[in-house]
């Protein structure tokens, strides 16, 4: 994956770096009635079926995947069954820092499936991979309010330092990479209204439950699908499970990427009219 890596001499009192990106966003909508020939690099598909440090595919992950997909025959059936399983068994936990850690084995073993998008969509991706369905997390950033009236599915463009969001994709024969986001279903159920919605058939949740199986709203920018990263020049040992927040270190150690005001980073977006 591509990234910006900057280093500053110890004599620089107030190091500063600014990055400007110009992107075009679009809604992703799948037409389930239309099938087409789709070719993908076998290396990409193998990567989307592989285990990572926090997404093992054996043990409790495989057992859970088998339970969730019991009776499902096609990859579409498996993806739909896992999507519904995640919504039925997991929940959004507002107290989770950042977007979560994505440690699905620990979550499944503990029985506590509460977390945020990097946890909840990671469960979806891990169960899909364990079922033989290529899937991947897509790490990115919301950049604008939702056009569909859901406050929890949008962001304040002027201040995006807490707008990071992970989505998911599955590769399905006849359709290619298809958008998914069970984590946002659970976010709406937990936070869109004062009461915690427990039933995805609720009038507020039902459109999101149906809409986010195969679709994404284009108020979001995807950065990468990488796992287990070795960042250049990183002093702290080990890998980064995913890359969605700015990372920084100095002689005293690593900065807290989930505390932008202490780290001192800001993110903003401006819509450019065509």
Per-segment meaning from a language model:
Residues 1-20:
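A surface-exposed beta-strand-loop module
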Residues 10, 23-27, 172:
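Non-catalytic surface loops within mature trypsin-like serine protease
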Residues 15-17, 21-34, 39-115, 125-126, ...:
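Secondary-structure boundary elements
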Residues 33-43, 100, 104, 151-155, ...:
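Generic alpha-helical propensity signal that fires on short helical segments
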Residues 44, 107-111, 149-153, 193, ...:
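Short alpha-helical interface elements
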Residues 122-235:
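Hydrophobic/aromatic-rich core segments of domains that either
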Residues 207-274:
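Low-complexity, Gly/Ser/Thr/Pro-rich intrinsically disordered linker/tail segments
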């Amino acid at each position: 994956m591509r990234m910006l890596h900057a280093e500053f001499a110890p004599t620089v009192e107030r190091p500063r770096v600014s990055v400007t990106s110009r992107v075009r966003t679009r809604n992703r909508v799948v037409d389930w009635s239309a099938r087409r020939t789709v070719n993908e690099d076998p290396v990409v598909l193998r990567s989307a079926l592989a285990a990572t440090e926090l997404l093992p595919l054996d043990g409790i992950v495989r057992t859970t995947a088998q339970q969730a997909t019991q009776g499902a025959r096609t990859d579409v059936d498996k993806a739909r069954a896992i999507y519904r399983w995640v919504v039925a068994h997991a929940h959004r936990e507002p107290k989770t820092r950042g977007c979560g850690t994505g440690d699905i084995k620990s979550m499944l073993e503990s029985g506590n499936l509460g977390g945020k998008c990097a946890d909840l969509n990671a469960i979806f991706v891990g169960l899909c991979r364990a079922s033989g369905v290529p899937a991947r997390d897509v790490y990115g950033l919301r950049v604008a309010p939702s056009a569909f009236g859901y406050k929890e599915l949008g962001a304040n463009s002027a201040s995006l330092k807490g707008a990071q969001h992970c989505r998911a994709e599955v590769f399905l024969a006849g359709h290619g990479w298809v958008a998914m986001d069970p984590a946002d279903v659970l976010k709406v159920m937990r936070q869109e209204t004062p009461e915690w919605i427990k039933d995805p058939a609720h009038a507020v949740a039902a459109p999101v439950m149906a809409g986010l199986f195969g679709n994404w709203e284009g108020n979001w920018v995807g950065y990468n699908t990488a796992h287990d990263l070795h960042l250049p020049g990183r002093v702290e040992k080990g890998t980064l499970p995913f890359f969605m927040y700015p990372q920084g270190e100095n002689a005293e150690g690593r900065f807290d990427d989930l505390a932008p005001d202490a780290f001192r980073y800001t993110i903003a977006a401006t819509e450019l009219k065509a």
